[in-house]
A protein has these predicted regions:
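Glycine- and aromatic-rich loop/turn segments at beta-sheet edges
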Residues: 121-147, 185-216, 264-283, 330-352, ...
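Active-site core of glycosidic bond-cleaving carbohydrate-active enzymes
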Residues: 151-157, 161-182, 249, 253-260, ...
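Non-catalytic C-terminal accessory modules of carbohydrate-active enzymes
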Residues: 4-12, 18, 428-603
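Acidic/polar, glycine-enriched structural segments that form the non-catalytic walls/loops
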Residues: 4-13, 17-149, 237-240, 245-247, ...
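Gly/Pro-rich turn-and-neighbor structural signature
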Residues: 111-112, 319-338
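Substrate-binding groove/exosite segments of carbohydrate-active enzymes
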Residues: 90-248, 358-372, 409-434, 443
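Long, charge-rich low-complexity segments
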Residues: 208-217, 284, 413-416, 538-553
Length: 603
């Protein structure tokens, strides 16, 4: 037995392996005494160091007045490094340099260790609820009032952040989160395979959550279809990263039944009456444009999942539904969502036929990202977003351009809660910017959030109103955020935008990874969890396999080099790299440089 005593202020991140699954016992809601095995991390913020203790056996941790006592069953080794470690929980290192600066890497590390790991409640906050705890993650670390887990809306971004890390621990957590949602669907007491808005620590589920408007004249149901639409993409992305076809086929039937429930809200014209999708204090009582855009995307991905599983008849069914909804979306109001007069998509159309339009960011941006428009319509949408981008980008990213025009019938009793910037809007705004190859703006967004996070000690709030229209008087004006403190959203979305959009390391249906950067010249990245590294310079790009096994990568450099698709195409860009092998593209036409000869080589 080996004893170690640490100061009381040190934060312990303990590891527990059970039945081949990795779990973290994080500092938040950590029990006074518990057991772990194999390794543990000790973060000393006062000394600005982090220690990794590794052992061949188990250990016990006890918090006492004199300090933190750790009893190891066997010998242990110690490795100490400065600051918050630039690695995931299992020790896979990552390195991000942009123009020689590690600013974004430091933000990534701090978000991961101070927020994402603390959100894992399976063996901490929910440790005694064995029937409930698997896949349970917290949306706020202030659990006194909001200790639930939120499958509708929140799990989407929890999963995006963890897929961006790509390590075995985070992927296992994603799997357990998916299994939790599927289990809730199968045990829906109405047998409608619904995903609840929330699951509380006592096991209570919230399905139909209604909000009333400030003037008490309107009410709307929250997140009616959000959970199941999100689950389709979550399962698809999980498959693309793991290639676990067995997991897909096992759960595809439950997902089909969940989508059957969603289809009930589709009318004969292909319009989805989806009510509120993301904004739970905006009274979208009817046909919600962004909900329908997400539904088109999800039904397309469901068609892909059915094709992967070899069920072509059902794949055709979902593809046809997606096409119907797309056709409806692009029609002029009142039949569709396009305003011929203003040349943009409206926000929602209520059940009385009233059109609500405040130049909603996602109602327009999603139409470009998801390919709903023809080129002329894309130009019109791009023009209106550019016209109001000074509002959208006050902080990444504001929900709408005209938030001051929302009425008391449109705003919920909780106040103008969602009429500001939020991570969920930024997530999809970033994908729109990626589609437009706007690497410079993606960089500015990441830097802006990292700057604010640093000012907040990486303990970010739920919404950032920036004292713009609302919350700018009295006590509310003393801070630029409101809602829940220590919130999950911006940390997870930051990782998603940095890794998936800016750096362009993403899951791929056929290859192990897609390398499709939308970054600026002078970007270098290395991620051991994915086994890849690349360097982008004015001379070109070099991509290397840094793992110990062959890796198949699809390469798409169309967002940083012009003429890429004409030269290489979408189907001829998959390369198999042996360990330590590099793939180089030199002399390419950078979007900021003059045209030059193109060539590629494997080294």
């Amino acid at each position: 037995m080996k004893k170690l005593i640490l100061d009381r202020g040190v934060k312990i991140y303990a590891h527990l392996e059970e039945n081949g699954n990795h779990y973290v016992i994080p500092p938040v809601a950590q029990p006074k005494a518990f057991a772990g095995n194999v390794f543990l991390w000790a973060l000393d913020e006062e000394e600005d160091t982090c220690s990794l203790f590794q052992t061949t056996g188990g250990y016990r941790v006890r918090h006492g007045r004199a300090g933190i006592e750790i009893l190891f069953d066997a010998d242990y080794s110690t490795a100490v490094q400065e600051g918050v470690p630039s690695c995931d929980f299992l020790g896979n290192a990552f390195c991000v340099r942009v123009d020689g600066s590690d600013h974004l890497e430091r933000a990534m590390a701090n978000f991961y260790w101070k927020s994402l790991l603390n959100q894992c409640a399976e063996r901490s906050f929910l440790r005694n609820k064995k029937w409930l705890r698997e896949g349970y993650v917290l949306s706020t670390l202030e659990t006194t009032f909001y200790g639930g887990t939120y499958p509708a809306v929140d799990h989407e971004f929890h999963i995006r952040g963890r897929l961006a890390m790509g390590d075995a621990f985070d992927l296992q957590l994603v799997r357990r989160m998916l299994e939790l949602q599927l289990r809730l669907m199968r045990t829906d007491w109405r047998r409608q395979f619904r995903i609840p808005c929330s699951l509380q620590p006592n096991g209570r589920r919230e399905y139909r959550v209604y909000r009333k408007s400030q003037d008490k004249k309107v009410k709307a149901v929250m997140f009616l279809l959000t959970g199941v639409m999100e689950l389709v993409e979550e399962l698809y992305q999980y498959y693309c990263l793991t290639k676990d076809i067995g997991f897909v086929t096992k759960h595809l039937g439950a997902l089909e039944r969940g989508l059957c429930f969603a289809e009930r809200f589709l009318d004969q014209n292909g319009r989805l009456w989806g009510d509120v999708y993301y904004e739970d204090q905006v009274m979208k009582d009817g046909a919600n444009a962004q909900a329908q855009a997400f539904a088109v995307h999800s039904f397309r991905l469901m068609a892909r999942l059915e094709t992967i599983a070899g069920v072509n008849e059902k794949a055709n069914h979902y593809a046809k539904l997606a096409n119907r909804m797309q056709h409806n979306y692009i029609q002029p109001v009142p039949g569709g969502y396009w305003s011929e007069q203003d040349s943009h998509y409206v926000d929602w159309i209520d059940r009385q036929g009233v059109v609500h339009d405040h130049i909603h960011l996602l109602s327009n941006a999603l139409s470009v990202t998801f390919g709903l428009n023809d080129p002329a319509r894309n130009d019109a949408v791009n023009a209106v977003i550019e016209q109001y981008d000074d509002v959208f980008q006050k902080f990444p990213s504001f929900v709408a351009a005209k938030i001051e025009d929302y009425t008391e019938s449109e705003i919920g009793v909780g106040g103008p809660y969602d009429l500001c910037a939020a991570g969920r809007y930024w997530c999809h705004d970033a994908k729109y910017r990626r589609e437009k190859a706007d690497a410079a703006l993606l960089k500015r967004q990441l830097e802006r959030v990292a700057q604010q996070a640093g000012a907040d000690n990486f303990d970010m709030g739920e919404r950032y109103d920036m004292n713009y229209i609302y919350y700018n008087t009295g006590e509310d004006s003393r801070r630029n955020w409101h809602g829940s403190p220590s919130y999950y959203e911006y940390p997870n979305v930051f990782l998603d935008v940095l890794v998936h959009d800016f750096l362009g390391i993403r899951p791929d249906e056929e290859a192990d990874l897609l390398i499709a950067p939308c970054c600026t010249i002078g970007t270098e990245v290395s991620m051991e969890s994915f086994g890849v590294a690349y360097q982008l310079s004015e001379q070109g790009i070099s991509i290397q396999n840094i793992s110990n096994m062959p890796k198949k990568v699809r390469v798409d450099l169309s967002k940083i080099f012009t003429g890429w698709e004409e030269r290489y195409g979408a189907s001829n860009s998959i390369y198999t790299l042996s360990p330590a092998q590099s793939l180089q593209f030199e002399g390419l036409f950078l979007r900021t440089e003059a045209q030059s000869e193109r060539k590629s080589s494997l080294l």
